[in-house]
Amino acid sequence: MDRELVRTVKLATKNHAGVLFRRAVRHLPHIVAVTALVAAAPRLSTLLAAAAAGGSTMRWARALWSDLAGELGPSAPALAVACWAAALAAYTYAASRPRPVYLIDLAGYKAPREHEASRAKTIAHFGRCGRFSGESMAFQKRMLERSGLGEATHFPTSLISLPVDMCLRTAREESHAVIFGVVDEVLRKSGVAAADVGVLIFNSSLLSPTPSFTSLIVNRYGMRPGVVSHNLSGMGCSAGIIAIDLAKRLLQVHENTYALVVSTENITLNAYMGNNRPMLVTNTLFRVGGAAILLSNRAADRRGRAKYQLIHTVRTHRGAHDQSFGCVTQEEDDAGEVGVSLSKELMVVAGEALKTNITTLGPLVLPISEQLRFLATVVLKRVFRADVKAYLPDFKLALDHFCIHAGGRGVLDELEKSLKLSPWDMEPSRMTLYRFGNTSSSSLWYELAYCEAKGRIKRGDRVWQIAFGSGFKCNSAVWRALRTVDAAGLDAGDNPWMKEVDMLPVDVPKVAPIDETSYQIPN
C-alpha cells in the first residue's frame, strides 16, 4: 500500500469520523430528552396525581423523587447526580454549538459605460501604449480571441486613456469607486446601518496601501470604534472564500452582529507593460470588479430576511510544494516592469489542489454511495494496480448550483470535464467571464448574482462556490438557500445582471477573431 493511498484513506477516515461524531452530538439533546421521558413514564401516575392535587412544579418533582427513592433506595442519590450531569452536558452542548451564519444580501460592482472596452478597443489601446513589441501584441491578440471574454468588460480609466496613467493616485481612484459602490449598495439593500456592523473584512491581493482599505471603509461610513477589522492581501483569487471563512470564525465569537466582507482587485497598478510572455496573459483576462457580502449570526435574521445559510467552508493550501508555490507570482522582468507571471504548470497544480479539496468536502456533502465508489477505485488502483480510472464523485447528487471562479476559459473547460458538469451548470461561470472578465476573488459573487437574476435559486437549493488562487490554494464554500429568490422583484440597482439577463446566455466560440478595424482611437 503506497503513501498516496494511505494518505487518502486516512483523510477519508478522519472526515467520516468527524461527520459521524457531529451527527451523534447534534442529536444529544434529543437523546437526553427521550431518555428522561422513558425514565419518567412508569411514574406518570404519580405525576398526574400530583398535578390533580394542584401545587407547584417543585411539588410534582418532589413527588416523583419520593417515588423513585422508594424504589431505588441507596442508589437514588447517584441517579440524581447522573441526571443532573446529563442535563448539564445537554446545556453545555447547546451553548457550544456553532452559531449559524447567514448571508443577508450581496452587491456586485458594475462600472459606468465609459469604462466598457471591446476587445478591439483593448488591442488598440495596448498598441498605442508604445511598450509592447509586435510579437507581444500578436500574442495578446491570440490570447484575447481565445479567452472567452466579451465586448463590454470594464477597464479603469487609467488604462483606457492616453497616455496610460498607472500611479498610486489612479489606483486609489479605481479601488474607491468599486469599494464605495458595493458597500453603499449592500447597506441600502439590507437596510443595515454601518454602525451595526461588528466585523469588517477586506481582501485585495495586489494593492495594500496605508492606511488600509478597512480603515478607509471605517472612516467613510463612521463605523463604531469596536469594529473587528482585517485587511487581507497577497492571497490571490481565492481570497474571497478565505474572507468568508474568517468571517464565519469571528461570528462564532462575536454575538448578535453583522459581518461585512468586501472582495476586489486593483487593475491599475497591476497591468503589465513589458514583453515577458508568461506575464502578458493577465492583461487579457483581468478586469475591474468587486463585491460586498453582508453576513449575520442573528437568529432573528433567519426568518424571512436572510437569503442563504453557510453550511461548509473547506480551505486547501498546497504551498508546501514548490511547484504549487511558484506557479503564480508577482515579479519584475529583466526591464524592471512588474507583473504577475503564470507558469505552464498552472492547470496541473490547480487539478491537484481541487482533488485535495474535494477529498475533504466530499464526506460533508456526498451520499455514502458516492463516497464508497470513490474509495473502491482508489483501492483497486493503488493496491491491486488495476487499470481503472480514478472515480470522481457526482457532486450534482448533493449540490444544485456551481459557481466556479471565472479565471479563464481553460480553467472552466477543465473543471466542466473533471466534475462532469453540464453546460447549464457552467453557464453562470462562463457568462461571468464573458460579461465581466476575470474579476479575481469577486467573480464567485457575480456568478451567484447571475443565478438569482435567472430565477434559479429555490428554497433548499445548495450552492457550491469553488475558488483557486496563488499559493497555491483551492477553497470551497457551500450555501443553502433559505428562501426562493424572486428574480421578478429585482431591478438594475439590486443586481448587476438585470439590464441584460434576458439576452444571456450567448454562445461563445472557442476562437472569436478580433476585427481591429471596428475601433479607431480618436486623435
Swiss-Prot record:
TM ranges: 31-55, 78-96
Quick one: a GO cellular component term? Answer: membrane
Tell me which family the UniProt entry assigns to this protein: Belongs to the thiolase-like superfamily. Chalcone/stilbene synthases family.
* Summary of the tissues where the protein is detected: Highly expressed in leaf sheaths. Expressed in leaves, flag leaves and panicles.
Catalytic positions are 237, 317, 401, 405, 438
GO annotation terms (biological process): fatty acid biosynthetic process
Its biological purpose is as follows: Contributes to fatty acids elongation. Plays a role in controlling leaf anatomy and plant architecture.
* Protein name, per record: Probable 3-ketoacyl-CoA synthase 20
Q: What organism is recorded for this protein?
A: Oryza sativa subsp. japonica
Q: What is its main location?
A: membrane
Gene name per UniProt: KCS20
Catalysed reactions, semicolon-separated: a very-long-chain acyl-CoA + malonyl-CoA + H(+) = a very-long-chain 3-oxoacyl-CoA + CO2 + CoA
- Compartments it resides in: Membrane
One GO MF annotation is:
fatty acid elongase activity
Recite the UniProt keywords alphabetically: Acyltransferase, Membrane, Transferase, Transmembrane, Transmembrane helix
Could you say which enzyme class this protein belongs to? Answer: transferase
Asked if the record carries the keyword tRNA processing, the reply is: no
Q: What is its EC number?
A: 2.3.1.199
Q: What domain of life is recorded for the organism? A: Eukaryota
Topology versus the membrane, per the UniProt entry?
Multi-pass membrane protein
Domain FAE: from-to ranges: 93-382
SUPFAM superfamilies, A to Z: Thiolase-like (SSF53901)
